[in-house]
Amino acid sequence: KGFSYVRAEYPIAVKRFQIAIDQAKEYGIVGKNIFGTDFSFDIEIRLGAGAFVCGEDTALLESIEGKRGQPRVKPPYPANAGLWQKPTLINNVETYANIAQIILKGSEWYSSIGTETSKGTKVFALGGNVNNIGLVEVPMGTTLREIVFDIGGGIPNGREFKAAQTGGPSGGCIPKENLDVPIDYESLKQIGSMMGSGGLIVMDDTKCMVSLAKFYLQFTVSESCGKCNPCRIGTKRMLEILERITEGKGEEKDLEKLDKLAKNIIRASVCGLGQTAPNPVLSTTKYFMDEYKEHVIDKKCRTNECKKLAKITINPELCKGCGLCSI
């Protein structure tokens, strides 16, 4: 039996997938005695409550079983003891979607697409400061420049490309000097990011990278299941440091603390959520350290996104007394 785990917040996707399952049963592709054989296979949709941690394979299994979504300690691995302690094959639906094409066209056809180590195509959800947003499918090894400028149509309003964030909230930020890096699993890892489920957010030069790192860390702090101390407490301490920095209260030693905390959290966390949560911080401190130092030393945010670092000059002759400068 197969289970498709979908967030309850996606009712249209759930409805459409259920229609597809029902149609497959009508054609005898799914269900009992498929094509008149003694082989039976059913597919059931299970709805998740939206917890980010349930993207981790064993937390997802716990959720399907009706338990709280928390990762299991490995080993044993799902292939040996998965759903209800039975051997379980667990993959993203995008992986399974490739199987039919490989069977129909052969492994050589599939291997001809992509790079030496990352075969096939990848679907990206392209968004952010880019003219053409939406889902795009490209061969592995396509450069970030091709995706952003050739497919995405470039940056709106004549702004400059500053960075792209791949891999969702736990991914890293890629600066413009890496625009021509081929997008595959190995290359992204080498530059401090990850493929994840294919999120790709483009940012222009109006974005503050310190504020961005804080934004993503706020998400992972709130989504931590709390099972292990490094993730539950460590990410919270990192967020507190970033909050101080964006409020003009940061010190130079905070930058060293951030780096040390991040590496300890990666090393000691139980599951992938904690192991990847520091990525936005590590990648922005690696490529945009000048912005961090501006916040800490000069008490300045070049984009004025960090409102407590903004400096406002009031012209008494033009002031209308609206009070907006105090907000």
How should each PLM-predicted stretch be described?
Residues 7-11, 47-54, 85-92, 133-138, ...:
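Hydrophobic alpha-helical scaffolding
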Residues 14-140, 152:
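Hydrophobic alpha-helical positions that pack around
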Residues 1, 144-147, 160-161, 224, ...:
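Extended, hydrophobic alpha-helical segments in both membrane/secreted and soluble proteins
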Residues 3-21, 41-43, 155-191, 286:
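Terminal amphipathic helices with adjacent charged low-complexity linkers/tails
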Residues 118-132, 138-140, 144, 302-327:
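C-terminal accessory/binding modules appended to enzymatic or scaffolding proteins
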Residues 63-75, 177-194:
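Active-site loop ensemble at the mouth of alpha/beta enzyme cores that anchors a bound cofactor
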Residues 141-157:
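Short amphipathic, charge-patterned alpha-helical segments
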Residues 15, 19-36, 180-316:
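Ferredoxin-type iron-sulfur electron-transfer modules in oxidoreductases and energy-metabolism complexes
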